[in-house]
C-alpha cells in the first residue's frame, strides 16, 4: 500500500467537519473492504443519493451503546453468528413529516438525521425500516478494529454527535471494491482515504482505555514479579486487569509476552477440562527464565462469555457438544475476546517489540492490529490429558490453534496434570 495515497487522520477529520464523505479501509487480514463514512449530523439527501449510487452497499448508521439504549435499538437477533460480530440492531425508519415509504433518499436522510439528533427518542422511529443501525463497542477502535467503531470515533473527533453513516463500497460488477478500485474512487471524487490502522494509532495517543491503579512486588512460586493493576476507563463493567512484569523494557530488544485471559476454573482450581492453568504457569516460568517479560492477565473469563455462561457451556459439552458448538448454542461466537486493552497495557509498559507466547494465530492478528510488532511466536506446549484432549482437538481443528494433540493420554493422570500447574 503506497503511503502517498493514504491521507492523514487529521485531514480526514477536517473533511468530516466540513460535511464531506471520506473512505475508510481496514486490514486485508480482516474484511479488506472500504466504506464511505460521514458524520451523521452532516448528512444531506444529496449525499445519501450519491452513496446509494456509487457505493451500492448497505446503508448503516453506527451509534454508541448508550445511544442504542436511549432509542431502544434492540439487537437484530439474539444469537449473533456474524463472521465479524457486526452488531446490527433492528432496522428503523423515521416517523416524521414528509417521510413516506422510508426508502427514498430524502426518507433515509431523515432517518439518519434523527438517529443523530440528541432530542430524538424511541417513539420517533418505526421498526423495521430501511436504515440499519449498528452498535459500536465502548472504547471505539481501541476495543474493536471495525468500520462501525471507526465511524463513531471519527464523528466524535470531527466535533459531531458520535453517530456515523457508513456504507460498504462495491465494484461495478457487484464484488467488493478492494484497494486499487478504492484509490480510483478517491481520485475521481476527490475524497480523503484513510486506514483503520492509522486511526487506531491516532487514538492510542489520545485516548485511554485503562489507567494504572496500583503497583506492588509479588513473589510467586514461579519467580518474583512487579504486579501492576489497571482500572478500565471505558468499560461499563469497570473490570480491572493485571500485568506481571519482569525486568526492564527500555531497550529495543524484543520482550517475551503472554496475553492470558482469566480462567477461574483452570487458573485457580486446576480444572482438567482445559489447559489454561498449565499455560499460565508455563508462561510465568518462561518469563522468569528469560529474565525479562510480561504477562497480561485480562478479565475475559470463558473467552469473553463470563463464568456463568462458561459453566453452562460445560453442561452442554457433557451432552456431546464441543466447545465451539456449546458457545453457539448459548448464542455466542466461539471467541469474544478483544485485545485492545491488552495492547494499551503493553504500550503503557513501553513494550515495542515482542516474542508472543501463544498457540492462537488470531491473537497475533488481534495485537498487530493495534500497531504492536510481533517478531516471533513462541508456542506453549502443554501435554493433553484424557479429559481435555477433545477440547484441545476442537481448538486446533475449528479455531485454528497451533496445538500438538498427539500424546498417550492414558499415561497422563490427574496427578500428573496437577503437578504441571
UniProtKB/Swiss-Prot annotation:
Binding site for GTP: 258-262, 279, 301-303, 323, 358, 363
EC number: 4.1.99.12, 3.5.4.25
Cofactor comment text: Binds 2 divalent metal cations per subunit. Magnesium or manganese. Binds 1 zinc ion per subunit.
Binding positions (Mg(2+) 2): 31, 147
Residue numbers annotated as active site: 335, 337
MF-aspect GO terms: 3,4-dihydroxy-2-butanone-4-phosphate synthase activity; GTP binding; GTP cyclohydrolase II activity; magnesium ion binding; manganese ion binding; zinc ion binding
UniProt pathway annotation: Cofactor biosynthesis; riboflavin biosynthesis; 2-hydroxy-3-oxobutyl phosphate from D-ribulose 5-phosphate: step 1/1; Cofactor biosynthesis; riboflavin biosynthesis; 5-amino-6-(D-ribitylamino)uracil from GTP: step 1/4
SUPFAM superfamilies: RibA-like, YrdC/RibB
Pfam families on file: DHBP_synthase (PF00926), GTP_cyclohydro2 (PF00925)
Listed NCBIfam families: PRK00393.1, PRK09311.1, ribA, ribB
Name of this chain's protein: Riboflavin biosynthesis protein RibBA
Gene: ribBA
Amino acid at each position: 500500500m503506497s503511503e502517498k495515497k493514504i491521507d492523514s487522520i487529521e485531514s480526514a477529520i477536517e473533511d468530516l467537519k466540513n460535511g464531506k464523505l471520506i473512505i475508510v479501509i481496514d486490514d486485508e487480514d480482516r474484511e479488506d473492504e472500504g466504506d464511505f463514512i460521514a458524520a451523521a449530523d452532516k448528512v444531506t439527501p444529496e449525499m445519501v443519493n450519491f452513496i446509494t449510487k456509487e457505493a451500492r452497499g448497505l446503508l448503516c448508521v453506527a451509534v454508541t451503546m448508550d445511544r442504542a439504549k436511549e432509542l431502544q435499538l434492540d439487537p437484530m437477533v439474539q444469537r449473533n453468528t456474524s463472521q465479524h460480530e457486526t452488531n446490527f440492531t433492528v432496522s428503523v425508519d423515521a416517523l416524521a413529516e414528509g417521510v413516506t415509504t422510508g426508502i427514498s433518499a430524502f426518507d433515509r436522510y431523515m432517518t439518519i438525521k434523527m438517529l443523530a439528533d440528541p432530542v430524538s427518542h424511541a417513539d420517533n422511529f418505526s421498526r423495521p425500516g430501511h436504515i440499519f443501525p449498528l452498535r459500536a463497542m465502548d472504547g471505539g477502535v481501541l476495543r474493536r478494529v471495525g468500520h462501525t467503531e471507526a465511524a463513531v470515533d471519527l464523528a466524535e473527533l470531527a466535533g459531531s454527535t458520535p453517530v456515523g453513516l457508513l456504507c460498504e463500497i462495491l465494484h461495478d460488477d457487484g464484488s467488493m471494491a478492494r484497494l486499487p478500485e478504492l484509490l480510483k474512487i478517491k481520485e475521481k471524487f476527490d475524497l480523503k482515504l484513510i486506514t483503520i490502522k492509522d486511526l487506531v494509532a491516532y487514538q492510542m495517543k489520545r485516548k485511554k482505555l485503562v489507567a494504572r491503579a496500583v503497583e506492588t512486588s509479588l513473589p510467586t512460586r514461579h519467580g518474583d514479579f512487579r504486579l501492576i493493576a489497571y482500572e478500565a476507563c471505558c468499560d461499563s463493567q469497570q473490570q480491572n486487569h493485571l500485568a506481571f512484569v519482569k525486568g526492564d523494557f527500555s531497550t529495543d530488544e524484543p520482550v517475551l509476552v503472554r496475553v492470558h485471559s482469566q480462567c477461574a476454573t483452570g487458573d485457580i482450581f486446576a480444572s482438567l477440562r482445559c489447559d489454561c492453568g498449565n499455560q499460565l504457569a508455563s508462561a510465568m516460568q518462561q518469563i522468569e527464565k528469560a529474565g525479562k517479560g510480561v504477562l497480561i492477565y485480562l478479565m475475559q473469563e470463558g473467552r469473553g462469555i463470563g463464568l456463568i455462561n462458561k459453566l453452562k457451556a460445560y453442561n452442554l459439552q457433557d451432552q456431546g457438544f464441543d466447545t465451539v458448538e456449546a458457545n453457539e448454542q448459548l448464542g455466542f461466537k466461539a471467541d469474544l475476546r478483544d485485545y485492545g486493552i491488552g495492547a494499551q497495557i503493553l504500550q503503557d509498559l513501553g513494550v515495542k517489540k515482542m516474542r508472543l507466547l501463544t498457540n492462537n494465530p488470531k491473537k497475533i492478528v488481534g495485537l498487530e492490529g493495534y500497531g504492536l510488532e510481533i517478531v516471533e511466536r513462541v508456542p506453549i506446549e502443554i501435554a493433553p490429558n484424557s479429559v481435555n484432549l477433545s477440547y484441545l482437538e476442537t481448538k486446533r481443528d475449528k479455531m485454528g490453534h497451533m496445538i500438538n494433540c498427539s500424546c498417550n493420554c492414558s499415561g497422563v493422570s490427574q496427578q500428573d496434570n496437577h503437578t504441571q500447574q
